[in-house]
Amino acid sequence: MNKISFVVPIYNEEENIRKLVEEIQAVAPDLSNDYEILLVDDCSNDGSLPVIRELKTQIPQLRYLSFARNCGQSAALYAGFQAASGDVIITMDADLQNDPTDLRQMYQHYGEFDMINGWRFNRQDTLSKKIASKIGNFVRNWMTKETIHDTGCSLKIMNAEMLKNVRIYKGLHRFLPTLMRMEGAKVIEVKVNHRQRLFGESKYTNLQRGIEGFYDLIAVRWMQSRHLTIEVKEEK
């Protein structure tokens, strides 16, 4: 049985953390009896870290990392990936918009596929965010030759060994399906539920995402063009 690491970046999600951990605990035993919940606090300036510390005293499976300064979502994810002890890594946002119950359906594909990417088919976001996402995914797929509808969906299941070989720079967490394929991963997309945010606020604006995403896209396209694919026919 695979050990599963749930890796969740945290930034100013004080009101959501307890419910988040409860929902993960409710679904985790259906996937594996061996699991850990790894929360990565990106130097939150609210009460997130005290909540995490309290939960740590109550839940044996919970671990956490706390950054000395704010480093961003990509850094939080990368640190979590490297610290995770599981064979399988599952990611999600801390804002409760992802629904962990979808993991039961998604995990059925693991083994045949090395990465299962969620697709927020019916997004509970503003119209402007939906439009920006559709444009972003279209341009991204056109340039990278990808077919994933929703690379920005944080609900993902990934082979840990492959994932730890991926070099993640600032912003490149948005391109994980492409980066995992470069490691030889088989990737599938599964429709998932998407819920409205109840507490807190989004940490990004559409303009910020668009500008950063464009430069990140150029970087990933360059990485694809320089990637070495070697297939040994014979060795004696």
Tell me what each language-model feature is.
Residues 70, 126-129, 133, 170, ...:
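Short-chain dehydrogenase/reductase
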Residues 111-151, 156-164, 215-222:
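Short, flexible, basic/aromatic active-site loop/helix in glycosyltransferases
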Residues 7, 53, 78-81, 107, ...:
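Conserved protein kinase catalytic domain
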Residues 82, 156, 173:
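Residues that recognize and position ribonucleotide moieties
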